[in-house]
Amino acid sequence: MSTGKFIVIEGMEGAGKSSAIAVIESTLNKHGIEYINTREPGGTPLAESLRDMVKSVDHQEKLTVETELLLMYASRSQLLANKILPALAAGKWVIGDRHDLSSRAYQGGGRGFDETIMNTISDITLKGFRPDITLYLDIDPHIGLSRAKARGDLDRIELEKMEFFIRVHNKYRELAEQDDSIITVDAAQAMLKVHQDVEKAVIGFITNTDKG
């Protein structure tokens, strides 16, 4: 039995990750590929508790940048060990709503956390594990935040100032340009075109996987 593949959707608030995930699900279903879904932070009972700590606006004390980053990686470590790796070993594919790239963009780019320290934490928790393919939905942060606000209540991170999200966006683009496993999709296009681009990327990946 072959191992499964890990597909990750990345992007800022309002980029359309949920609808893109639905396209990936539909594409995998058409190809008869069994899969599970995950999200970060979260994805297991303990990881979901950590998610609440990270995203809640009700804290009586301010989370330090270090605490935020460590909670993210603690959640990711739990998810990887308890859900992602077992599913891949069982031959299932995994669709991830965010992964390590988010921490690189948000805590690294947005918060300005030291990259060398982040690399060490990532090495300890992920042990070199990487997605097989990442689809990055690229959108101007002004447009994305406008969409997010239209959805309703914002979480602690979504309430950050625009300058923060501009730094996040710049870091996402920088990282995407450096990594051939990251496919950038223009999320400012009409939704139909975005979905077509996502489907095309997934089909191309499936085809290459079958050949390999």
Swiss-Prot record:
Query: Any stretches that span the bilayer, and where are they?
Result: none
PROSITE patterns, per the entry: THYMIDYLATE_KINASE
State the InterPro entries in the record. Answer: P-loop_NTPase, Thymidylate_kin-like_dom, Thymidylate_kin_CS, Thymidylate_kinase
One GO cellular component term of this record is: cytosol
State any single GO MF term.
ATP binding
Q: Which domain of life does the protein's organism represent?
A: Bacteria
Binding residue positions for ATP: G11, M12, E13, G14, A15, G16, K17, S18
Name one process (GO BP) from the record: dTDP biosynthetic process
Family matches, as SUPFAM superfamilies: P-loop containing nucleoside triphosphate hydrolases (SSF52540)
Q: Which cysteines are joined by disulfide bonds?
A: none
Q: What is its EC number?
A: 2.7.4.9
Q: Which UniProt keywords apply?
A: ATP-binding, Kinase, Nucleotide biosynthesis, Nucleotide-binding, Transferase
Gene3D superfamilies for this protein: P-loop containing nucleotide triphosphate hydrolases (3.40.50.300)
Oxidoreductase: is it a keyword of this entry?
no
Instruction: List the catalytic activities from the record.
Output: dTMP + ATP = dTDP + ADP
Q: Which Pfam families match?
A: Thymidylate_kin
Q: What does this protein do?
A: Phosphorylation of dTMP to form dTDP in both de novo and salvage pathways of dTTP synthesis.
Q: Which family does it belong to?
A: Belongs to the thymidylate kinase family.
The protein, known as: Thymidylate kinase
Please name the gene that encodes this protein.
Answer: tmk
